[in-house]
């Protein structure tokens, strides 16, 4: 009896899940490449490689911990991966991994001040020559606090051109990641929203930093994040060293200086750059329980 139940269950699983069906029908390939990839992973020390290709924006109002979460992510990558020995597939040898942070907020770890998005494009062009000379592999992390407001500066946002967008779309190949923060995802420039991967909604309770990860495209189609089911949730405990890891006064001073220099866009230009689209909840596939209830009651 139990054998029949298990057999029927296995057939249902194979029928419903293409990945399981593919693995079951290619047992020798799964075994061979499983061993081969595991050996390569250990031999090339891939566990030391810093993950790149992220285009994430942390969102939340004042006191929600969006900048705290942004800095926690960026400094965590530096502390974990900088100086590690990694395999460079282009040169076919082991080199030292170098984590280069471009940030407009003062950090407790080494960083270069981010004055313009052109620096991100420049990093994709000059780091290879630097790496060849110093036997390194540079990972570039762009950290942009108050991204929505920063893009209101002409000198900062004028670099959002096809070259910059192409760099972002191929950022994994250039070993680049971009992390930003904004009060609301809709406050960010439309061109940036179109290439964003994840939106992280932040909520802080005492020293408990609770964050929810959303697909950026699905969040683009609703006005209320509660209508979308999070991809995942996480929480971490905030320590004193996390508060000391950054200073946002540099961001405020830079914005004040740009305003005094009349470098900011007009209100009409700001609203046009945001290009708010009409919400299309029907385009959301990962609806929350609240959204499904609203749909049923229509």
How should each PLM-predicted stretch be described?
Residues 1-8:
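Feature marks short, highly hydrophobic, charge-poor N-terminal signal-anchor/signal peptide-like helices
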Residues 45-53, 80-81, 85-86, 90-94:
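Phosphate-binding P-loop
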Residues 106-170:
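Conserved nucleotide-sensing/catalytic segment adjacent to the nucleotide-binding pocket
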Residues 212-298:
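Conserved P-loop NTPase motor module
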Residues 98-99, 138-141, 174-180:
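Loop/turn-to-beta-strand initiation segments
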Residues 13-48:
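N-terminal pre-Walker A segment at the start of P-loop NTPase domains
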Residues 51-83:
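Glycine-rich P-loop/Walker A and Walker A-like loops and their local beta1-loop-alpha1 context
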């Amino acid at each position: 009896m139990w054998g029949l139940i298990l057999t029927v269950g296995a057939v249902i699983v194979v029928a419903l899940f293409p990945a399981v069906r593919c693995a079951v029908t290619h047992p020798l390939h799964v075994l061979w490449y499983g061993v081969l990839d595991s050996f390569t992973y250990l031999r090339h020390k891939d566990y030391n490689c810093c993950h790149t290709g992220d285009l994430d924006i942390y969102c939340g109002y004042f006191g929600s911990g969006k900048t705290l979460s942004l800095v926690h992510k960026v400094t965590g990558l530096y502390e974990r991966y900088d100086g590690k020995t990694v395999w460079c597939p282009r040169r076919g040898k082991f080199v030292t991994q170098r984590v280069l942070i471009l940030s407009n907020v003062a950090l407790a770890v080494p960083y270069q001040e981010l004055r313009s998005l052109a620096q991100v494009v420049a990093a994709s062009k000059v780091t290879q020559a630097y790496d060849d000379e110093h036997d390194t592999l540079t990972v570039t992390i762009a950290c942009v606090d108050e991204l929505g407001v920063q893009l209101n500066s002409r000198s900062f946002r004028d670099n959002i051109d096809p070259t910059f967008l192409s760099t972002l779309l191929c950022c994994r190949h250039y070993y680049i990641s971009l992390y930003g923060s904004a009060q609301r995802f809709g406050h960010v420039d439309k061109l940036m929203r179109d290439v964003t991967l994840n939106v992280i909604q932040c909520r802080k309770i005492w020293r408990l930093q609770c964050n929810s990860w959303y697909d950026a495209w699905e969040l683009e189609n609703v006005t209320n994040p509660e209508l979308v089911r999070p991809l995942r949730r996480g929480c971490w405990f905030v320590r004193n060293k996390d508060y000391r890891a950054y200073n946002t006064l540099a961001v405020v001073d830079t914005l004040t200086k740009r305003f005094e220099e009349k470098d900011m866009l007009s209100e009409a230009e700001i609203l046009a750059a945001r290009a708010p689209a009409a919400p299309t909840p029907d385009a959301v596939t990962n609806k929350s329980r609240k959204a499904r209830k609203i749909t049923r009651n229509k």
